[in-house]
A protein has these predicted regions:
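Conserved nucleotide- and phosphate/pyrophosphate-binding catalytic cores
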Residues: 157, 163-360
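Extreme N-terminus of proteins, especially the signal/transit-peptide cleavage junction
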Residues: 1-3, 346-347
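Pocket-edge structural micro-motifs
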Residues: 7-9, 84, 145, 195, ...
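N-terminal Rossmann-like or analogous alpha/beta NTP/dinucleotide-binding catalytic cores
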Residues: 2-139, 257, 296, 306
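Residue-level "edge-of-site" marker
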Residues: 83, 149, 351
Length: 360
């Protein structure tokens, strides 16, 4: 069996460092590993419209923003297929068929759906498309016969529901769909990077994001405003690293090379943490180090983004070619699904040439 990856993002805004450590960095590594036969990266505009139906221009404008961030991070169209979800109509048809295999009560129990509904204040009136988001995601994954799906921790319930749909379809119609494996980030800090205010999730509406495209001064300003240990008032006070946003970011981004380059008094992060916990290390010094680390990581990303910003027609051509390739792959899966469900009427010569028998 071919080893295939599918992953992607909703185009509702520029991508931030949470996206980077949660998924993007890993995608580039997987793409470059040579271990996979195909890598599909989807800009999920149709899913974005499920809670932005009245604001299509927001989704439309952000497709190019996400594409620029992809290319800036190192996703290579020669190695990965970058495509737009709505340009692959087979995904909608697959979603419709899978809906018959999932109950409303099962969707209601999905923790990710429940959290998203609460966050968007949809309790009173949930758009049907948004409610069926996990089914749409299952269609995306199975359409490309993905064997591995790299996701952040918050998407784990979605992937579990996808596997349920695969098992149900295969048990009803015969072995047709590929059962995907889930791949989570290895570093706990990367599972869900908090916002700079210490809140559980980065959000554009909360204004607590560091974007991949932020300029150096913006990054520095955001780092210096980060939430730390509120009880660490004086430098000599012992500090807590648990729930300390600065140290969470250092867990996700810093390497021993960064210490050698920017903070040679410490060999690694463990030494820095130990000093902070026993007292005598100020928050400003730690924040300055984090700023240097982030600038070092984000500078080449920002430079590549500036390069592609001057070549927008070329970016759209990359998406056009990728969408065409993705459509061909999804069409092949849809053909197999229709055949398994026995709704491929005009491909079935035996059916069309069968003598009429009256039904009783």
């Amino acid at each position: 069996m071919s080893k295939i990856i599918l992953t992607g993002d909703r185009p509702t805004g520029r991508l931030h460092v949470g996206h980077y450590v949660g998924s993007l960095r890993q995608r580039v590594q997987l793409q470059n590993s040579g271990a996979y036969d195909k890598v599909y990266i989807m800009i999920a505009d149709a899913q974005a419209l499920t809670d932005n139906a009245e604001h299509p221009e927001k989704v439309r404008k952000n497709i190019i923003e996400v594409a620029l961030d992809y290319l800036a991070c190192g996703l290579d169209p020669a190695k990965s297929t970058l495509f737009i979800q709505s340009m692959v109509p087979q995904l909608t048809e697959l979603t419709f068929y899978y809906m018959n295999l999932v109950t409303v009560s099962r969707l209601q129990r999905n923790p990710t759906v429940k959290n998203e509904i609460k966050m968007r204040n949809f309790e009173a009136s949930i758009p049907t498309g948004f409610f069926c988001y996990p089914i749409s995601q299952a269609a995306d994954i199975t359409a490309f016969r993905a064997t591995v799906v790299p996701v952040g921790e918050d998407q784990l319930p979605m992937l579990e529901q996808c596997k349920e749909i695969v098992h149900k379809f295969n048990s009803v119609y015969g072995e047709t769909l590929v059962d995907p494996d889930i791949m989570l980030p290895q570093n706990d800090a990367c599972l869900r990077l908090p916002g700079i205010d210490g809140k559980a999730k980065m959000s554009k509406s909360l204004g607590n994001c560091i974007y991949l495209s932020d300029e150096p001064e913006d990054i520095k300003k955001k780092v210096m405003s980060m939430y730390t240990d509120p009880d660490h008032v004086r430098v000599e006070d012992p500090g807590k690293i648990e729930c300390n946003t600065v140290f969470t970011y250092l867990d996700a981004f810093s390497t021993e090379e960064h210490f050698a380059k920017f903070l040679p008094d410490y060999a690694n992060l463990d030494e820095l943490k130990a000093h902070y916990k026993r007292g005598g290390l100020g928050d400003v010094k730690v924040k300055k180090f984090l700023n240097n680390v982030l600038q070092d990581v984000l500078e080449p990303i920002r430079e590549r983004r500036h390069y592609w910003e001057q070549r927008i027609p070329e970016v759209y051509e990359i998406l056009r070619a990728g969408s065409k390739e993705a459509e061909a792959a999804a069409a092949a899966t849809l053909h197999d699904v229709r055949e398994a469900m026995r709704i491929n009427y005009f491909d079935d010569e035996a059916l069309m040439n069968q003598p009429y028998e009256k039904q009783h």
